[in-house]
Amino acid sequence: RDVVAAVTNAGGYGVLGALAYEPERLEVELDWIDDHVDGKPYGVDFAMPAKYEGQGGGDKATPEYLASLIPEEHRAFADSLMEEAGIPEMPEDFDAAPKAAGLNVDLEGPGQVEVTLAHDNVNMVINALGPPPKYVVDECHQRDVLVGGLVGSRQHAERQLAIGTDVIIAQGTEAGGHCGDISTMVLVPQVVDAVGPDVPVLAAGGIQDGRQMAAAMALGAQGVWTGSMWLLAQEADMHPEVTENLLDATSTDFIRSRAMTGKPARQYRSAWVDAWEREDAPDTLPMPIQGLLFGEYSRRWSRVHSKEFGGHPAGQIVGSIDKVRPARDMVLDMVQGWIDVAEQFG
């Protein structure tokens, strides 16, 4: 939330990733942002997948039921990784609500949207992993709130338009988190051509300075969507070992893997990611079951601040960043860089 406020106050458009928040917690976060942006608009980003285990809700969508689907083979494999690394088990009295992309979408999604739309400063709701549910689009439009959608192909963009999405975010494979396999340079013009001149397109993936923003706009985008760069903003709430890994990384250290969520997502190549690439590793599980497994074990290594296992979804652009800086400076430098390129071309 601190990054959202800092970016917004610097003249950018901050967006809060709401995946991990139950409605009650989301209310707290949005209230805080409202109190720190002086009436400026910002957005909220969800990850409501088009396909996931437990879709439709009911008894077979509960975290307890989905966790019961984790095979013993997978737990044994994860246990062996922890034992080899000397990472202890969690205390017996430890209790935490399970979190994973694609979990509790049907149960908590309506409440998350209701909370979000009750905040007047929120003027866009964005969804990843497919078009948002129809009720999200309808409720947003009833309140004059824009709907944005991340896409990784021309076909994805067409499906977003069919459901009424207002802003298309063309996210290339360089991006952090869930992404496709088409590069930003190729994808953006394809999406711009597919949606036509009346639908704004934002470019995402491999963008963190003014040169890349200028290139994206030359491809037909009307702006850029940035994510991974903010992991290294001064205001970001990151574990120190993860920040250290990101600063030391090169662009080749960020690979697409299903090890974290069950769907292809670009992330730092931690020991957990490497392990699931091994020949003796079991197949990854579908979303959100793989995410539940990851969440269970990530609590263990986070508790002891394991640098070896300290990973995070992040894009290839992080390999170009070598220091932590205030978010305001990052915004202003990007704008100045764009101006410099524009002046070069007259």
Where are these regions (language model features)?
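Active-site entrance/lid segments in N-terminal catalytic domains of soluble metabolic enzymes
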Residues: 1-198
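Conserved active-site-proximal phosphate/metal-binding subdomains
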Residues: 60-77, 181, 186-202, 208-346
